[in-house]
Regions:
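Hydrophobic alpha-helical segments
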Residues: 1-140
């Protein structure tokens, strides 16, 4: 929980990254952690409408956009996004966010490939906040 990027935002970045890669296990855990670290119900319920939402600052919006682009294959971080990102974040903060995205790149692949069994508390958060929640792969 150290660094310049808030713990709340790092968890939302992890959630967005996990959603892009499709790992239900990590989605549930990151949305639960974002809630614990202070994300509002409105932010969590509408995280995919962040671009138009007043519940996210411009700084948070570009961070979530970065998470989507950096988590995509092929990578979609382009010059325009890089310029927008640097309006709000310095190199250290960008590296911190990319560290979260990279960590979840590993965790998403590991937990999804292994079908890691989801814990009851994480399942509750998934049902509460994630539209289309279906962790069947992680229930056995």
């Amino acid at each position: 929980n150290k660094g310049q990027v808030s713990s709340k935002l790092k968890r939302m970045i992890g959630f967005v990254s996990s959603r892009v890669t499709g790992c239900n296990y990590c989605q549930a855990h990151t949305i639960r952690a974002a809630e614990r670290y202070g994300a509002s119900d409105k932010q969590l319920e509408n995280i995919w409408e962040f671009r138009e939402s007043r519940d996210f600052s411009d700084k948070e919006k570009v961070a979530l956009e970065f998470s989507i682009a950096a988590s995509s294959i092929p990578n979609r971080v382009d010059e325009n996004l890089s310029k927008e990102l640097r309006k709000y974040w310095d190199d250290g903060e960008i590296i911190e966010m990319l560290g979260v995205i990279s960590l979840f790149g590993f965790l998403n692949r590991w937990n999804d490939s292994m079908g890691t069994r989801i814990e009851e508390e994480a399942d509750v958060s998934g049902k509460k906040y994630i539209k289309g929640w279906n962790p069947i792969k992680h229930k056995s």
